[in-house]
């Protein structure tokens, strides 16, 4: 008889959970892409994913997380920790965030475009995105603290991590508001350059 805590059983259970989570995400995004976010109700997503509404709620207590959440935060933190020692914090964050967003764009451009459009057009999605980036900010702050010899709750560390994530959010919104026509990678670099220098002053006559 297989024990409850058998590693094989636990592994199978975890893979099943991951498959269910992925199916719910795909269903929600398909409905949102075709009909808009308001049409992506819990009941409709459940039917599309072939699960019960209670299963959808169990995996995603906040509906917008179906659209917004992924498993990338841990990977992003690991990338930041792997950057060369002594590298400027802004350049470290530039490298890892541009790499992560570029990889997402290459892997599934339509998914990233959908997220960006709904963030720009749907206040509830935009608000939830702001909330979910708080955990990303905490992870990045921990890594920055370790790299700079500061405490994770150091004001400068928290402000810096939050500023970078806020700037990147504005870059994605800017991209979406202009029809997703511009080169996103170039916009990300432009955004982080602006964070370093501020907006250029007008030329004096």
Where do the model's predicted regions map?
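Basic, helix-initiating cap at the start of DNA-binding domains
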Residues: 1-39, 43-51, 78
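C-terminal peripheral helix-coil segments that are non-catalytic and often amphipathic
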Residues: 1-7, 180-205
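Short amphipathic alpha-helical segment with a characteristic S/N-K-E followed by hydrophobic residues
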Residues: 24, 62-67
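Residue-level detection of the helix-turn-helix DNA-binding "recognition helix"
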Residues: 47, 61-62
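Short hydrophobic/aromatic patch on the recognition helix
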Residues: 51-60
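Short secondary-structure transition hinges
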Residues: 74, 110-138
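Hydrophobic alpha-helical connector segments
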Residues: 77-115
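Hydrophobic/aromatic-rich alpha-helical bundle segments in the mid-to-C-terminal region
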Residues: 130, 146-193
């Amino acid at each position: 008889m297989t024990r409850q805590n058998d590693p094989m059983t636990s592994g199978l259970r975890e893979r099943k959970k991951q498959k269910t989570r992925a199916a719910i995400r795909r269903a929600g995004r398909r409905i949102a892409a075709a009909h808009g976010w308001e049409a992506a109700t819990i009941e409709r997503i459940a039917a599309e994913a072939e699960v019960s509404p209670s299963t959808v709620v169990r995996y995603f207590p906040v509906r917008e997380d179906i659209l917004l959440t992924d498993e990338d935060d841990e990977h992003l933190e690991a990338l930041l920790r792997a950057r060369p020692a002594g590298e400027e914090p802004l350049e470290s964050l530039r490298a890892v965030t541009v790499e992560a967003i570029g990889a997402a764009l290459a892997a599934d451009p339509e998914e990233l475009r959908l997220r960006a459009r709904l963030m720009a057009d749907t206040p509830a999605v935009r608000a939830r995105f702001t909330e979910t980036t708080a955990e990303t900010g905490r992870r990045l702050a921990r890594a920055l603290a370790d790299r700079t010899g500061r405490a994770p709750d150091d004001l400068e560390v928290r402000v810096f991590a939050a500023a970078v994530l806020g700037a990147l959010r504005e870059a994605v919104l800017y991209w979406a508001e202009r029809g997703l026509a511009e080169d996103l990678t170039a916009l990300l670099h432009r955004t982080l350059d602006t964070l370093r220098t501020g907006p250029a002053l007008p030329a004096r006559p």
